[in-house]
Design a protein with these regions (language model features):
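Bacterial N-terminal signal peptides that target proteins for export
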Residues: 19-32
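Exported/periplasmic ABC-transporter solute-binding proteins
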Residues: 45-302
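C-terminal motif of bacterial Sec signal peptides marking the signal peptidase cleavage site
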Residues: 40-44
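Intrinsically disordered, low-complexity repeat and linker tracts
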Residues: 3, 18, 187-190
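N-terminal cationic amphipathic segment used for targeting or macromolecule association
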Residues: 31-34, 45
Length: 302
């Protein structure tokens, strides 16, 4: 992805071999130091997490998204879990929020841009809060991108919409998550027609707002946004059932080969608990143990 406001780290493949050797031994030294330090911490990685007394809490209700969800795929990959500890499967962001808000023992995950404080709260992860600054600098451990994809050539109106997303539309993206570039002036060519967009429930609110604002500029266009999940959206784009697919997960190699993609925003996966839960911070290691069914009660975190 082009680096604008979202920062990612890349490795230069042309580094001199001697530099690589120096870096190797520095890394070994840091590893040994961190190994010694790690034994003093509550968690196996990240910053120290202070866990309050949770003896009054009960069995953890582990809430996951459904198979095919881009949020689930990214969460599982980033945490390194097989999610065998899942108790409740929710097939949308709203259902995750509803489940966690109604159960003080529940834990779940949603798009940071969707967190609305309605009976739930987002936890810090490894001491880092999910916010625009930590996402922009890629400091929060559970960052991910929002992607629009298409197969083959776009229609004139779809091209015009994409031009809007890449320019003035970035101001709309900024209201939800971190944009990938500064907003720029957009001049529509006023192409007419319909654009079908399918996929991620996490990306859908942003894309729906982009569509709404674009149609104000170009009344000849009709942009239809249908929510399903990232995998379905990608498959629909591959098979020609829509003009654009929305994904909140990274593309598989074969998807990247067959589809043209554009990252239009950077977001994070927020870990949420009931607002009555006294926990404020959690480590990636703890999340893995919860979702792997190694921690089944809140008291296991201490």
């Amino acid at each position: 992805m082009t680096k604008y406001k979202c920062e990612r780290t890349y490795i230069d493949s042309n580094i001199d071999r001697s530099c690589k050797r120096d870096r190797y031994w520095k890394m070994i030294g840091k590893f040994l130091a961190m190994t010694a330090l790690g034994s003093l911490l509550l968690t196996g990685c990240g910053a120290k997490v202070d866990v309050p007394d949770m003896s009054s809490m009960g069995t953890i209700n582990v809430v996951s998204r459904e198979e095919g969800s881009g949020t689930k795929t990214e969460f599982d990959n980033l945490v390194g879990t097989d999610a065998t500890g899942t108790n409740t499967v929710a097939d949308s962001t709203d259902k995750v929020i509803s489940e966690v808000a109604s159960d003080k023992n529940a834990i779940g995950y949603i798009a940071y841009s969707a967190e609305n404080n309605s009976g739930v709260k987002a936890l810090d992860v490894d001491g880092v809060a999910p916010d625009a600054a930590s996402i922009e600098k890629d400091k929060y451990p559970l960052c991910r991108d929002y992607i629009l994809v298409y197969n083959g050539e776009l229609s004139a109106v779809a091209k015009d919409f994409m031009a809007y997303v890449k320019s003035a539309g970035q101001a709309v993206v900024a209201d939800y998550c971190v944009p990938v570039k500064k907003s720029e002036t957009f001049l529509s060519d006023k192409s007419g027609g319909t654009v079908e967009i399918h996929g991620s429930t996490s990306a859908a609110p942003i894309v729906s707002k982009l569509a709404e604002e674009y149609m104000k500029i170009n009344p000849a266009a009709k942009i239809l946004v249908t929510e399903s999940d990232s995998t379905q959206g990608l498959n629909d784009a591959l098979q020609g059932r829509c003009d654009l697919g929305m994904s909140s997960r990274s593309l598989q190699p074969y998807e990247s080969e067959l589809l043209t993609s554009y990252v239009f925003g950077c977001d994070a996966i927020a870990v949420i608990v009931n607002s009555e839960n006294t926990l404020s911070d959690i480590s990636v290691d703890m999340l893995k143990k919860i979702y792997d069914k190694k921690y089944t009660a809140w008291s296991d975190l201490r």
